Amino acid sequence: DREGAGKHIQAGAKKVLITAPGKGDIPTYVVGVNAELYSHEDTIISNASCTTNCLAPFVKVLDQKFGIIKGTMTTTHSYTGDQRLLDASHRDLRRARAAALNIVPTSTGAAKAVALVLPNLKGKLNGIALRVPTPNVSVVDLVVQVSKKTFAEEVNAAFRDAAEKELKGILDVCDEPLVSVDFRCSDVSSTIDSSLTMVMGDDMVKVIAWYDNEWGYSQRVVDLADIVANNWK
């Protein structure tokens, strides 16, 4: 929160970049989505979560091209340090279970946090996380209802266009039948698995996107820090 991060300012830091979702009124920026709105007046900012960094870029494309009415997201996420290696105590009883032995359903604020960088989507997205026994790389499964009728090839074409233009280096599209380990050390925020894109009844769209929740996210932290440095006054 602002009080906790503010201790760094009190100790002499000029800026604080939180590498996690911020609380309260802390401004949130996602590179490729709204980072161009960064103001030098912001002393404490958040780079959101790795999952929001994966989700927001391709959600932005979907909303701009087809208009998102509502949707849900599931991230199948490698287990993290906030879980227990052995069954033990935790405020979340599911995270209390042995992380390397279980699929652990738990909460995530990633979908709702998209509204912090794309305000027009406030109240339209929600989701959960499934923590799984893999060391790295995660995958988002998004299902949305859209206002414009479409089909899978058109959806993938929109992603390809964005990946080659305004979201180059942020979004990628993969046509190969790959698995999670193939996306280790991927520099982009999200990679669309084109063969898994589905459209039901011409207005319900399902998109699968891979992301390296460690390395890929770290790249965006560096990018945002660079934006802060380049706007120094």
Swiss-Prot record:
GO cellular component terms given for this protein: chloroplast
Phylogenetic placement of the source organism: Eukaryota, Viridiplantae, Streptophyta, Embryophyta, Tracheophyta
GO BP annotation list: reductive pentose-phosphate cycle
Coiled coil: none
Binding site for NADP(+): 213
Note: Plants contain two types of GAPDH: cytosolic forms which participate in glycolysis and chloroplast forms which participate in photosynthesis. All the forms are encoded by distinct genes.
Protein's recorded name: Glyceraldehyde-3-phosphate dehydrogenase A, chloroplastic
GO molecular function: glyceraldehyde-3-phosphate dehydrogenase (NADP+) (phosphorylating) activity; NAD binding
